[in-house]
Amino acid sequence: MENKSHAFLLEWTVNFIKNKDIISRKIEKIKNGKDGFDLYVKYKDREQYFIIAPNIIDIDSIIKRINNNAYFSLVTLNSKENFDAVLKSWSKMISFKFLNIIFVNPFSGLDKKWIVFPYTHHKISDESS
C-alpha cells in the first residue's frame, strides 16, 4: 500500500509543479531519484528537491537531508498523524529558509492541497498559533 501511495503522490507532485509552471515556464528539467531525493526539479533560477512521504514515520531522518543551500519540499498526505509529526519537529523545521511542506488531500472535493513554509510562518505569526 505504501508503494502505491508513494507512486500516486509522486505523480501528483509532477503534475502539480508542471501546472504551476504553465505561465512562467521556468522548469528546465525534472528528474527522479537525483541525490537520493524522490524528485529533482531544475528551474532557470534555482534547484528544488522533493521528498515524498505519504506517511511520515521518521521525520528526523527527513530533516537530516535538508539544508539551507537549496529549495526543499516535503510532500505528504493530509492526515492528523502527518500533521502531528510536523508539529512535533516544528522547532527544527523553522530553521530552513527554503523548506515548504505540501499536505495533499487527493480525494477532497474542494481543497486538494495546502502548503506551509515553516520559516516564513514562524517569522510572521504568533507563537501560540
What is the predicted role of each segment?
Residues 66-71, 86-129:
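Non-catalytic C-terminal interaction segments of nucleic acid-processing enzymes
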Residues 1-45:
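Acidic-basic catalytic patches of nuclease active cores, encompassing PD-(D/E)XK
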Residues 28-34, 49-56, 75-80:
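Structural motif
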Residues 39-41, 72-75, 101:
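Hydrophobic beta-strand residues in large extracellular and virion-surface proteins
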Residues 47-68, 81-87:
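Active-site-adjacent loop/helix micro-motif of nuclease/hydrolase catalytic cores
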Residues 44, 55, 77-81, 94, ...:
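Short, flexible beta-strand-to-coil junctions
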Residues 14, 49-51, 60-63, 96, ...:
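Intrinsically disordered, low-complexity regions
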